């Protein structure tokens, strides 16, 4: 009853209840005028061009006529489901169709669709519609690849000065990276008996396995020394004040060592090779003192394996990590920032030269810098835990010197 009252209220003037030819207008709950949803309108349409069927705002050419979305959908459903034989009209099939009355007589609306020229043969059945959608997706993917290839071709590559910088950074990395490309042949696996026993009665397995920790401390000093040697060989680093050099080295040391381990992740054995010589499993590294930091380094190794980084890209990543101007205590922040910008620009141009076929490769690679910075921050906190759990005599002096005073 309430519904009928609302229907009557929508036509306030009694004269408006009749067609121009004197026929009575029929009413339903949809007779209130609704604004069309604003959306994409093709450029070939004039502003507010009307639908040739109902005079609502048209959205484009549909089945050979300029129509609105509503009439397009009505015509498509009618043909696809073969509904028109069942349509009927109570008023001699001569209703006037507009945007207010279009839903009140399906037969007259369909007849008008045909009369204005909408083509039944252009309505696709289900199989053709699926094939068309597939073709559209294939074309869209093809265009995306073409645009990506075109944008890659138009990106700047390194200048002669940048090539020289890249060569020096790569040489610095290769000369300080233990075992080089022969690490798989040279590595030795840490025995399974070390560091893989579950730590019982300790919350979250937070106890440090001293045997595994002792094994790791044997390789930590040469690993740190190689990071220092790498930094000393870098252009611009030696020009910084000694105090800033020390701050930068302490800040990036764990990050660079983690990167060097991560790029030596082996999916077959599920190990990382530390310092180019010791292959360890996730639980061994975790129980040997690193805890959750172990998970972060292994996860990084897994994700980096898809990037197929070469020595130059690893070297430039290390240079970017080293020249981080937000390290606490720096006296020449601006100078360090300019150094990092120089390396970043050369790095980006080198990535353009390499033409990786991974979408958005450069920003994705930069996200790994963020991951490595997080690993460094987590390790600083983890180091405090190791100091509590492990006897002082197990800590090599250089290990203490680099990590003891880091901010947590």
Swiss-Prot record:
3,3',5-triiodo-L-thyronine binds at residues 226, 275. InterPro entries: NHR-like_dom_sf, Nucl_hrmn_rcpt_lig-bd, Nuclear_hormone_rcpt_NR1, Nuclear_hrmn_rcpt, ThyrH_rcpt, Znf_hrmn_rcpt, Znf_NHR/GATA. Residues 48-125 bind DNA. SUPFAM superfamilies: Glucocorticoid receptor-like (DNA-binding domain), Nuclear receptor ligand-binding domain. Zn(2+) 2 binds at residues 89, 95, 105, 108. One of its GO terms (cellular component) is RNA polymerase II transcription regulator complex. The keyword Cytoplasm does not apply. A zinc finger (NR C4-type) spans 51-71, 89-113. GO terms for biological process: cell differentiation; negative regulation of transcription by RNA polymerase II; positive regulation of transcription by RNA polymerase II; retinoic acid receptor signaling pathway; thyroid hormone receptor signaling pathway. Keywords: DNA-binding, Metal-binding, Nucleus, Receptor, Transcription, Transcription regulation, Zinc, Zinc-finger. Residues 1-50 are annotated as: Modulating. Pfam families: Hormone_recep, zf-C4. Zn(2+) 1 binds at residues 51, 54, 68, 71. It is found in: Nucleus. A high level expression seen in the gills, intestine and muscles. One of its GO terms (molecular function) is zinc ion binding. Residues 161-405 form the NR LBD domain. SMART domains: HOLI, ZnF_C4. The keyword Transcription applies. Nuclear hormone receptor that can act as a repressor or activator of transcription. High affinity receptor for thyroid hormones, including triiodothyronine and thyroxine. Composed of three domains: a modulating N-terminal domain, a DNA-binding domain and a C-terminal ligand-binding domain. Belongs to the nuclear hormone receptor family. NR1 subfamily. This is Thyroid hormone receptor alpha.
């Amino acid at each position: 009853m309430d519904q009928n009252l609302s229907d009557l209220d929508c036509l306030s003037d009694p004269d408006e209840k009749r067609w121009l030819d004197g026929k009575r207008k029929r009413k339903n709950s949809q007779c209130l005028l609704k604004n069309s949803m604003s959306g994409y309108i093709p450029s070939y349409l004039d502003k507010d061009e009307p639908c040739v069927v109902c005079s609502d705002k048209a959205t484009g050419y549909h089945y050979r006529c300029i129509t609105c979305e509503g009439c397009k959908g009505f015509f498509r459903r009618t043909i696809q489901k073969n509904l028109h034989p069942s349509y009927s009209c109570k008023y001699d099939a001569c209703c006037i169709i507009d945007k207010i009355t279009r839903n009140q007589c399906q037969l007259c609306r369909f007849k008008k669709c045909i009369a204005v020229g909408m083509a039944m043969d252009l309505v696709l059945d289900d199989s053709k519609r699926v094939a068309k959608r597939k073709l559209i997706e294939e074309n869209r993917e093809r265009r995306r690849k073409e645009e990506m290839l075109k944008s890659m071709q138009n990106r700047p590559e390194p200048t002669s000065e940048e090539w020289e910088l890249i060569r020096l950074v790569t040489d610095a990395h290769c000369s300080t990276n233990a075992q080089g490309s022969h690490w798989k042949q040279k590595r030795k696996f840490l025995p399974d008996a070390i560091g893989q026993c579950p730590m019982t009665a300790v919350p979250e397995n937070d106890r440090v396995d001293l045997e595994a920790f002792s094994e790791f401390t044997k390789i930590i000093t040469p690993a740190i020394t190689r990071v220092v040697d790498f930094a000393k060989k870098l252009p611009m680093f030696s020009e910084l004040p000694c105090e800033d050099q020390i701050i930068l080295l302490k800040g990036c040391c764990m990050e660079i060592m983690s990167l060097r381990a991560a790029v030596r992740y082996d999916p077959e054995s599920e190990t990382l090779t530390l310092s180019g010589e010791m292959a360890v499993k996730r639980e061994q590294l975790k129980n040997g003192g690193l805890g959750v930091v172990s998970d972060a380094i292994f996860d990084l190794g897994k994700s980096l394996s898809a990037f197929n980084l070469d020595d130059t890209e690893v070297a430039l990543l290390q240079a970017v990590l080293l020249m981080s101007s937000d390290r606490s205590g720096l006296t020449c922040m601006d100078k360090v920032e300019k150094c990092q910008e120089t390396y970043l620009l050369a790095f980006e141009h080198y990535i353009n030269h390499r033409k990786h076929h991974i979408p958005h490769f450069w920003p994705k690679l930069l996200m790994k810098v963020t991951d490595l910075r997080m690993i460094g921050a987590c390790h600083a906190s983890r180091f405090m835990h190791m100091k509590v759990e492990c006897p002082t005599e197990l800590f090599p002096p250089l290990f203490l010197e680099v990590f003891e005073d880091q901010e947590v």
